[in-house]
Protein backbone atom coordinates (compact mmCIF):
# COMPACT_ATOMS: atom_id res chain seq x y z
CA UNK A 1 0.00 0.00 0.00
CA UNK A 2 1.70 3.20 -1.09
CA UNK A 3 1.98 6.15 1.24
CA UNK A 4 0.72 9.59 0.23
CA UNK A 5 2.65 12.53 1.66
CA UNK A 6 0.53 15.63 2.32
CA UNK A 7 2.64 18.81 2.25
CA UNK A 8 1.46 21.78 4.30
CA UNK A 9 3.54 24.88 3.74
CA UNK A 10 3.68 28.01 5.91
CA UNK A 11 5.69 31.15 5.20
CA UNK A 12 8.94 31.71 7.07
CA UNK A 13 8.95 28.12 8.39
CA UNK A 14 10.59 24.85 7.20
CA UNK A 15 8.56 22.49 5.07
CA UNK A 16 7.06 19.59 7.03
CA UNK A 17 5.51 16.35 5.88
CA UNK A 18 2.78 14.33 7.52
CA UNK A 19 2.70 10.64 6.64
CA UNK A 20 -0.60 8.77 6.46
CA UNK A 21 -0.61 4.96 6.56
CA UNK A 22 0.45 2.15 8.87
CA UNK A 23 2.82 2.74 11.73
CA UNK A 24 6.39 3.20 10.53
CA UNK A 25 9.16 1.10 11.93
CA UNK A 26 11.79 3.80 12.06
CA UNK A 27 12.24 7.40 11.08
CA UNK A 28 15.61 8.85 10.31
CA UNK A 29 15.96 12.60 9.85
CA UNK A 30 19.06 13.98 8.22
CA UNK A 31 19.84 17.63 7.66
CA UNK A 32 22.72 18.77 5.58
CA UNK A 33 24.03 22.00 4.31
CA UNK A 34 25.21 20.92 0.90
CA UNK A 35 23.78 19.36 -2.21
CA UNK A 36 22.26 15.93 -1.40
CA UNK A 37 21.93 12.99 -3.74
CA UNK A 38 19.83 10.05 -2.59
CA UNK A 39 19.34 6.70 -4.34
CA UNK A 40 16.68 4.56 -2.65
CA UNK A 41 16.82 0.78 -3.06
CA UNK A 42 13.86 -0.84 -4.69
CA UNK A 43 14.52 -4.40 -3.51
CA UNK A 44 12.16 -5.58 -0.79
CA UNK A 45 14.79 -7.84 0.79
CA UNK A 46 17.23 -5.17 1.77
CA UNK A 47 16.89 -4.67 5.49
CA UNK A 48 18.89 -1.52 5.56
CA UNK A 49 17.74 2.02 5.01
CA UNK A 50 18.25 3.73 1.68
CA UNK A 51 21.84 4.52 0.89
CA UNK A 52 22.62 8.17 0.89
CA UNK A 53 25.76 9.54 -0.65
CA UNK A 54 26.58 13.10 0.28
CA UNK A 55 29.46 15.31 -0.64
CA UNK A 56 29.64 16.85 2.80
CA UNK A 57 29.46 15.60 6.34
CA UNK A 58 25.86 14.99 7.48
CA UNK A 59 25.10 13.90 11.02
CA UNK A 60 22.86 10.88 11.24
CA UNK A 61 20.39 9.98 13.95
CA UNK A 62 19.61 6.38 14.81
CA UNK A 63 16.03 5.20 14.63
CA UNK A 64 13.89 5.76 17.67
CA UNK A 65 15.43 9.08 18.63
CA UNK A 66 13.28 12.21 18.57
CA UNK A 67 13.65 14.40 15.54
CA UNK A 68 15.90 17.43 15.53
CA UNK A 69 14.40 20.74 16.53
CA UNK A 70 13.35 23.24 13.92
CA UNK A 71 15.94 25.31 12.27
CA UNK A 72 16.53 28.72 13.71
CA UNK A 73 15.39 31.91 12.05
CA UNK A 74 18.93 32.62 10.99
CA UNK A 75 19.03 29.59 8.71
CA UNK A 76 20.59 30.15 5.34
CA UNK A 77 18.52 29.90 2.17
CA UNK A 78 20.66 26.91 0.98
CA UNK A 79 19.73 24.65 3.93
CA UNK A 80 17.94 21.38 3.14
CA UNK A 81 16.21 18.57 4.97
CA UNK A 82 15.87 14.87 4.11
CA UNK A 83 13.27 12.60 5.66
CA UNK A 84 13.39 8.84 5.13
CA UNK A 85 10.75 6.42 6.36
CA UNK A 86 10.78 2.57 6.46
CA UNK A 87 7.55 0.80 5.69
CA UNK A 88 6.60 -2.70 6.99
CA UNK A 89 7.16 -4.20 3.53
CA UNK A 90 10.73 -2.96 3.54
CA UNK A 91 10.18 -0.11 1.14
CA UNK A 92 11.76 3.18 1.97
CA UNK A 93 10.48 6.59 0.98
CA UNK A 94 12.86 9.47 0.87
CA UNK A 95 11.65 13.03 0.49
CA UNK A 96 13.76 16.06 -0.12
CA UNK A 97 12.66 19.59 0.59
CA UNK A 98 14.38 22.92 0.71
CA UNK A 99 13.69 25.30 3.57
CA UNK A 100 13.00 28.85 2.42
CA UNK A 101 14.53 31.87 4.12
CA UNK A 102 12.87 32.90 7.36
CA UNK A 103 13.55 36.58 6.72
CA UNK A 104 10.67 38.63 5.55
CA UNK A 105 10.89 39.95 2.04
CA UNK A 106 11.46 43.73 2.32
CA UNK A 107 12.37 46.02 -0.56
CA UNK A 108 15.80 47.57 -0.49
CA UNK A 109 16.40 50.97 1.00
CA UNK A 110 17.09 52.63 -2.34
CA UNK A 111 13.75 51.50 -3.70
CA UNK A 112 11.98 52.86 -0.66
CA UNK A 113 13.78 56.19 -0.93
CA UNK A 114 12.92 56.49 -4.60
CA UNK A 115 9.26 55.81 -3.88
CA UNK A 116 9.18 58.46 -1.13
CA UNK A 117 10.89 60.95 -3.39
CA UNK A 118 8.34 60.26 -6.13
CA UNK A 119 5.43 60.83 -3.70
CA UNK A 120 6.93 64.05 -2.36
CA UNK A 121 7.60 65.25 -5.91
CA UNK A 122 3.97 64.67 -6.90
CA UNK A 123 2.76 66.51 -3.78
CA UNK A 124 5.07 69.41 -4.59
CA UNK A 125 3.80 69.57 -8.16
CA UNK A 126 0.19 69.58 -6.96
CA UNK A 127 0.74 72.40 -4.48
CA UNK A 128 2.61 74.43 -7.07
CA UNK A 129 -0.23 74.09 -9.57
CA UNK A 130 -2.83 75.03 -6.95
CA UNK A 131 -0.87 78.10 -5.88
CA UNK A 132 -0.41 79.12 -9.52
CA UNK A 133 -4.16 78.93 -10.12
CA UNK A 134 -4.87 80.93 -6.96
CA UNK A 135 -2.44 83.69 -7.84
CA UNK A 136 -3.89 83.91 -11.34
CA UNK A 137 -7.43 84.25 -10.02
CA UNK A 138 -6.32 86.84 -7.45
CA UNK A 139 -4.62 88.94 -10.12
CA UNK A 140 -7.70 88.79 -12.34
CA UNK A 141 -9.97 89.81 -9.46
CA UNK A 142 -7.70 92.69 -8.52
CA UNK A 143 -7.75 94.13 -12.05
CA UNK A 144 -11.49 93.72 -12.69
CA UNK A 145 -14.03 95.85 -10.76
CA UNK A 146 -16.38 93.91 -8.50
CA UNK A 147 -19.70 92.96 -10.05
CA UNK A 148 -21.67 92.44 -6.86
CA UNK A 149 -23.57 95.35 -5.36
CA UNK A 150 -22.91 96.23 -1.77
CA UNK A 151 -25.30 98.26 0.36
CA UNK A 152 -23.73 101.59 1.22
CA UNK A 153 -25.37 103.57 3.98
CA UNK A 154 -24.68 107.28 3.36
CA UNK A 155 -23.46 109.36 6.24
CA UNK A 156 -24.33 112.96 7.03
CA UNK A 157 -21.62 114.16 4.65
CA UNK A 158 -22.05 115.03 1.01
CA UNK A 159 -20.55 111.79 -0.36
CA UNK A 160 -21.27 108.23 0.74
CA UNK A 161 -18.30 106.22 2.06
CA UNK A 162 -16.69 103.43 0.08
CA UNK A 163 -17.19 99.91 1.34
CA UNK A 164 -13.74 98.25 1.57
CA UNK A 165 -15.03 94.69 1.75
CA UNK A 166 -17.04 93.49 -1.24
CA UNK A 167 -18.74 90.12 -1.01
CA UNK A 168 -17.46 87.71 -3.66
CA UNK A 169 -19.09 84.57 -4.98
CA UNK A 170 -15.95 82.59 -5.85
CA UNK A 171 -15.82 79.01 -4.52
CA UNK A 172 -12.10 79.08 -3.74
CA UNK A 173 -11.24 79.37 -0.02
CA UNK A 174 -8.67 82.12 -0.62
CA UNK A 175 -11.05 84.41 -2.50
CA UNK A 176 -11.66 86.56 0.58
CA UNK A 177 -8.06 87.70 0.48
CA UNK A 178 -8.52 89.13 -2.98
CA UNK A 179 -11.90 90.60 -2.12
CA UNK A 180 -10.33 93.21 0.18
CA UNK A 181 -9.54 95.47 -2.74
CA UNK A 182 -10.96 98.98 -2.84
CA UNK A 183 -12.99 99.44 -6.05
CA UNK A 184 -12.04 102.13 -8.50
CA UNK A 185 -13.75 105.49 -8.82
CA UNK A 186 -15.83 104.30 -11.76
CA UNK A 187 -17.43 101.56 -9.68
CA UNK A 188 -18.14 103.91 -6.77
CA UNK A 189 -20.56 105.88 -8.91
CA UNK A 190 -22.39 102.69 -9.83
CA UNK A 191 -23.06 101.82 -6.21
CA UNK A 192 -26.59 102.92 -5.25
CA UNK A 193 -27.18 105.21 -2.32
CA UNK A 194 -30.16 104.24 -0.21
CA UNK A 195 -32.42 106.52 1.82
CA UNK A 196 -31.00 107.43 5.22
CA UNK A 197 -32.87 106.64 8.39
CA UNK A 198 -34.62 109.83 9.49
CA UNK A 199 -36.17 110.27 12.88
CA UNK A 200 -39.55 111.53 11.69
CA UNK A 201 -42.64 110.84 13.80
CA UNK A 202 -45.16 108.25 12.72
CA UNK A 203 -47.51 110.92 11.38
CA UNK A 204 -44.84 112.24 8.99
CA UNK A 205 -43.66 108.90 7.57
CA UNK A 206 -44.95 108.17 4.09
CA UNK A 207 -44.50 105.16 1.80
CA UNK A 208 -43.21 107.38 -0.99
CA UNK A 209 -39.56 106.77 -1.97
CA UNK A 210 -38.55 110.40 -1.43
CA UNK A 211 -38.04 111.27 2.26
CA UNK A 212 -37.21 114.92 1.44
CA UNK A 213 -39.92 117.52 1.72
CA UNK A 214 -40.43 120.37 -0.72
CA UNK A 215 -39.24 123.78 0.54
CA UNK A 216 -42.72 125.24 0.95
CA UNK A 217 -43.94 122.28 2.94
CA UNK A 218 -40.85 122.25 5.11
CA UNK A 219 -41.26 125.90 6.06
CA UNK A 220 -44.90 125.24 6.75
CA UNK A 221 -44.09 122.35 9.05
CA UNK A 222 -41.53 124.46 10.89
CA UNK A 223 -44.04 127.19 11.53
CA UNK A 224 -46.86 124.78 12.27
CA UNK A 225 -49.06 125.53 15.24
CA UNK A 226 -52.32 124.01 16.54
CA UNK A 227 -55.27 125.04 14.44
CA UNK A 228 -57.39 127.87 15.77
CA UNK A 229 -60.61 129.45 14.82
CA UNK A 230 -59.61 132.41 12.71
CA UNK A 231 -61.52 135.46 11.61
CA UNK A 232 -61.71 136.97 8.17
CA UNK A 233 -58.67 139.13 8.77
CA UNK A 234 -56.26 136.22 9.37
CA UNK A 235 -54.91 134.13 6.48
CA UNK A 236 -53.86 130.47 6.87
CA UNK A 237 -50.95 129.33 4.75
CA UNK A 238 -51.53 126.10 2.86
CA UNK A 239 -48.84 123.54 1.97
CA UNK A 240 -47.96 123.13 -1.66
CA UNK A 241 -48.60 119.37 -1.60
CA UNK A 242 -49.95 116.94 0.98
CA UNK A 243 -47.53 114.59 2.65
CA UNK A 244 -49.04 111.42 1.22
CA UNK A 245 -48.99 112.61 -2.43
CA UNK A 246 -45.85 112.63 -4.59
CA UNK A 247 -43.85 115.84 -4.68
CA UNK A 248 -44.19 118.32 -7.56
CA UNK A 249 -41.65 118.32 -10.42
CA UNK A 250 -39.73 121.14 -8.75
CA UNK A 251 -38.37 118.74 -6.16
CA UNK A 252 -37.22 116.12 -8.69
CA UNK A 253 -33.60 117.04 -8.03
CA UNK A 254 -34.00 116.37 -4.32
CA UNK A 255 -35.72 113.08 -5.01
CA UNK A 256 -32.91 111.96 -7.32
CA UNK A 257 -30.41 112.83 -4.64
CA UNK A 258 -32.09 110.58 -2.12
CA UNK A 259 -32.39 107.53 -4.38
CA UNK A 260 -30.13 107.23 -7.43
CA UNK A 261 -30.36 103.91 -9.25
CA UNK A 262 -29.16 105.01 -12.67
CA UNK A 263 -25.56 105.19 -11.47
CA UNK A 264 -25.06 108.95 -11.92
CA UNK A 265 -23.15 110.78 -9.15
CA UNK A 266 -24.95 113.15 -6.85
CA UNK A 267 -25.51 116.74 -7.99
CA UNK A 268 -22.92 119.13 -6.59
CA UNK A 269 -25.45 121.31 -4.81
CA UNK A 270 -27.48 118.65 -3.08
CA UNK A 271 -26.52 117.42 0.33
CA UNK A 272 -28.14 115.37 3.04
CA UNK A 273 -28.67 118.40 5.25
CA UNK A 274 -32.43 118.00 5.05
CA UNK A 275 -32.22 114.76 7.01
CA UNK A 276 -30.67 116.64 9.90
CA UNK A 277 -33.33 119.37 10.03
CA UNK A 278 -35.99 117.74 12.16
CA UNK A 279 -39.55 119.07 12.28
CA UNK A 280 -41.07 119.84 15.65
CA UNK A 281 -42.48 116.81 17.46
CA UNK A 282 -46.06 115.99 16.69
CA UNK A 283 -48.17 117.02 19.68
CA UNK A 284 -51.74 115.76 19.49
CA UNK A 285 -54.23 118.52 20.22
CA UNK A 286 -57.77 117.95 21.50
CA UNK A 287 -60.24 117.82 18.64
CA UNK A 288 -62.52 120.60 19.77
CA UNK A 289 -64.93 121.84 17.10
CA UNK A 290 -64.29 125.33 15.90
CA UNK A 291 -67.80 126.34 16.77
CA UNK A 292 -67.16 125.68 20.45
CA UNK A 293 -64.28 128.13 20.72
CA UNK A 294 -65.47 131.73 20.48
CA UNK A 295 -63.53 134.46 18.79
CA UNK A 296 -61.76 137.15 20.75
CA UNK A 297 -63.69 139.79 18.88
CA UNK A 298 -66.98 138.58 20.32
CA UNK A 299 -68.50 140.42 23.28
CA UNK A 300 -68.30 138.86 26.70
CA UNK A 301 -72.02 138.36 26.98
CA UNK A 302 -72.23 136.53 23.65
CA UNK A 303 -70.08 133.54 24.68
CA UNK A 304 -72.09 130.47 25.65
CA UNK A 305 -71.30 128.58 28.82
CA UNK A 306 -70.52 124.90 29.33
CA UNK A 307 -72.81 123.08 31.73
CA UNK A 308 -71.95 120.30 34.13
CA UNK A 309 -73.43 117.65 31.87
CA UNK A 310 -71.13 118.65 29.02
CA UNK A 311 -73.74 120.38 26.86
CA UNK A 312 -73.46 124.00 25.82
CA UNK A 313 -75.98 126.20 27.57
CA UNK A 314 -77.50 129.31 26.01
CA UNK A 315 -75.86 132.61 26.97
CA UNK A 316 -77.16 134.27 30.10
CA UNK A 317 -79.25 137.35 29.40
CA UNK A 318 -78.16 140.52 31.15
CA UNK A 319 -81.61 142.09 30.88
CA UNK A 320 -84.98 140.92 32.06
CA UNK A 321 -86.44 138.22 29.88
CA UNK A 322 -89.44 139.21 27.89
CA UNK A 323 -91.09 138.86 24.54
CA UNK A 324 -89.26 140.19 21.57
CA UNK A 325 -90.55 143.57 20.40
CA UNK A 326 -92.06 143.89 16.99
CA UNK A 327 -89.51 145.33 14.57
CA UNK A 328 -90.16 148.61 12.86
CA UNK A 329 -90.74 149.02 9.17
CA UNK A 330 -87.31 150.48 8.49
CA UNK A 331 -85.33 147.72 10.12
CA UNK A 332 -84.06 144.77 8.17
CA UNK A 333 -84.52 141.21 9.46
CA UNK A 334 -81.61 139.41 11.05
CA UNK A 335 -80.58 136.12 9.45
CA UNK A 336 -77.55 134.50 11.11
CA UNK A 337 -75.67 131.87 9.13
CA UNK A 338 -73.69 129.05 10.69
CA UNK A 339 -70.70 127.82 8.70
CA UNK A 340 -68.73 125.70 11.13
CA UNK A 341 -66.65 128.18 13.13
CA UNK A 342 -67.21 130.58 15.97
CA UNK A 343 -68.98 133.71 14.99
CA UNK A 344 -67.27 137.04 14.72
CA UNK A 345 -69.29 140.22 14.76
CA UNK A 346 -68.82 142.80 12.08
CA UNK A 347 -70.94 145.89 11.57
CA UNK A 348 -71.94 146.59 8.01
CA UNK A 349 -72.32 150.29 7.35
CA UNK A 350 -74.47 152.17 9.80
CA UNK A 351 -77.49 149.92 9.74
CA UNK A 352 -76.18 147.82 12.62
CA UNK A 353 -76.59 144.47 10.89
CA UNK A 354 -74.60 141.66 12.44
CA UNK A 355 -73.55 138.82 10.15
CA UNK A 356 -72.52 135.61 11.87
CA UNK A 357 -70.63 134.05 8.99
CA UNK A 358 -67.23 132.45 9.02
CA UNK A 359 -65.34 130.42 6.43
CA UNK A 360 -63.89 127.14 7.69
CA UNK A 361 -60.13 127.27 8.02
CA UNK A 362 -57.89 124.66 6.48
CA UNK A 363 -56.26 122.05 8.68
CA UNK A 364 -52.60 121.80 9.36
CA UNK A 365 -52.13 119.37 6.47
CA UNK A 366 -54.33 120.93 3.85
CA UNK A 367 -57.45 118.98 4.83
CA UNK A 368 -60.53 120.92 5.96
CA UNK A 369 -61.57 119.95 9.45
CA UNK A 370 -65.18 118.90 9.65
CA UNK A 371 -67.24 121.20 11.87
CA UNK A 372 -69.51 119.92 14.59
CA UNK A 373 -72.86 118.61 13.48
CA UNK A 374 -75.51 121.24 14.08
CA UNK A 375 -79.19 121.45 13.56
CA UNK A 376 -80.25 124.98 14.33
CA UNK A 377 -83.58 126.59 13.75
CA UNK A 378 -83.64 130.18 12.67
CA UNK A 379 -85.72 132.68 14.63
CA UNK A 380 -89.18 133.06 13.23
CA UNK A 381 -89.79 136.62 14.42
CA UNK A 382 -87.82 139.55 12.99
CA UNK A 383 -85.78 141.76 15.31
CA UNK A 384 -86.27 145.45 15.82
CA UNK A 385 -83.64 148.13 15.96
CA UNK A 386 -83.77 148.09 19.73
CA UNK A 387 -83.10 144.39 19.79
CA UNK A 388 -80.19 144.86 17.41
CA UNK A 389 -78.78 147.50 19.70
CA UNK A 390 -79.16 145.10 22.61
CA UNK A 391 -77.29 142.48 20.63
CA UNK A 392 -74.47 144.91 19.84
CA UNK A 393 -74.05 146.12 23.41
CA UNK A 394 -73.97 142.60 24.82
CA UNK A 395 -77.35 142.52 26.57
CA UNK A 396 -78.92 139.37 25.20
CA UNK A 397 -82.60 138.48 25.47
CA UNK A 398 -83.47 134.78 25.32
CA UNK A 399 -83.57 133.60 21.69
CA UNK A 400 -86.90 132.74 20.21
CA UNK A 401 -85.73 129.68 18.24
CA UNK A 402 -84.18 126.41 19.40
CA UNK A 403 -80.81 126.67 21.04
CA UNK A 404 -77.92 125.17 19.05
CA UNK A 405 -75.89 122.88 21.31
CA UNK A 406 -72.99 121.03 19.65
CA UNK A 407 -71.29 118.11 21.34
CA UNK A 408 -67.69 119.00 22.11
CA UNK A 409 -65.01 116.35 22.53
CA UNK A 410 -63.98 116.16 26.17
CA UNK A 411 -60.78 114.59 27.33
CA UNK A 412 -61.17 112.22 30.29
CA UNK A 413 -59.97 113.68 33.56
CA UNK A 414 -60.15 117.34 32.55
CA UNK A 415 -62.52 119.55 34.57
CA UNK A 416 -65.39 121.14 32.74
CA UNK A 417 -65.09 124.89 32.75
CA UNK A 418 -66.57 127.53 30.46
CA UNK A 419 -64.50 129.41 27.93
CA UNK A 420 -63.44 132.91 28.95
From Swiss-Prot:
Residues 137-157, 253-263 have a biased composition (Polar residues). The keyword Transport applies. One of its GO terms (biological process) is transport of virus in host, cell to cell. Residues 1-77, 137-181, 195-219, 235-281, 327-370, 396-420 are annotated as: Disordered. The keyword Amino-acid biosynthesis does not apply. Residues 60-69 have a biased composition (Pro residues). Residues 1-18, 30-59, 158-181, 327-348 have a biased composition (Low complexity). Keywords: Transport, Viral movement protein. It comes from the Viruses. Cell-to-cell movement. This is Putative movement protein.
